[in-house]
Amino acid sequence: MRVDKFLNAVCITKRRAIAEDMCRSGVVSINDNVVKASKEVRVGDTISIKFTTHTDSYKVLAVPTSKNVPKNAQSEFVEKL
């Protein structure tokens, strides 16, 4: 699954367009490598998002098969580090 779709599916971003913009701006990285929106996410990857005041990191536990995941099921797919 593409990183922009993944961020939207597991409710890290509200819209896929926001995730695409974040990737285009260079604030999203997987395993310490800045990535484009089309980068594939795999189980075990660490996704980091840089904000102006802090950085959020998430470990991918599973890749969802559906387009959207309920917010209460987010912990099945990502673990906040």
Please report, for each region that a protein language model flagged, where it lies by residue:
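C-terminal structural segments of small proteins and small subunits
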Residues: 55-81
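A generic structural micro-feature
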Residues: 40-41, 52
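A basic, amphipathic helix-loop patch mediating RNA/tRNA/ribosome contacts
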Residues: 1-40
